């Protein structure tokens, strides 16, 4: 398994991995199901949304991928809360116009994500990073890919770039257990719109 930062040429494949991993994630279904009459429209929306997220972070943040024989099998999307500033213009130039048909779900989903991540993105004196998305392709789940990717690539990248903390939000107790096994502590828990939200944090030894 090899690791590298994604390029713009990878964006559609990366977006597909995110959609495949999140399509049946309970949080997504709880927040978004009522807006879609068919699964095909729901998947189309997720692909477009994830493409904008990925392309914006390739340009301004960090999109790290794990590959096996040239296949993208895991993705980590993250930002330095001190240095990364992704603006509305960045989203627009990354394809946000393609979401115009999906105004209502977007108006619901993005505020939900903002509210969910408030505690994780709380500014401190530390150089905190935020892990916005972390997924393993469904075909590769259950093979310890996520743990290796986190320990061998994600945390070392944060350290090399001068980060001293990495925070994230998750919505399942199973994921909380996974992150705790890799050194994260639960620092906050709440419920938003019927969805459980756990905030996790790990200290990172900065190399800068």
Which residues does each predicted region cover?
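Conserved acetyl-CoA-binding loop-helix of GNAT-fold acetyltransferases
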Residues: 136, 142-156
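Short, basic, low-complexity termini and linkers enriched in Ser/Thr/Gly/Pro
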Residues: 205-208
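Conserved acyl-donor/pantetheine-binding loop and adjacent beta-alpha core of acyl/acetyltransferases
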Residues: 77-135
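A short beta-loop-alpha structural element at the N-terminal edge
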Residues: 2-29
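Conserved active-site alpha-helix within GNAT-family acetyltransferase domains
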Residues: 147, 160-163, 172-189, 196
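Active-site rim helix/loop that mediates acceptor-substrate recognition in acyltransferases
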Residues: 36-60
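Conserved beta-hairpin
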Residues: 59-76
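Conserved GNAT acetyl-CoA-binding A-motif
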Residues: 122-129, 157-171
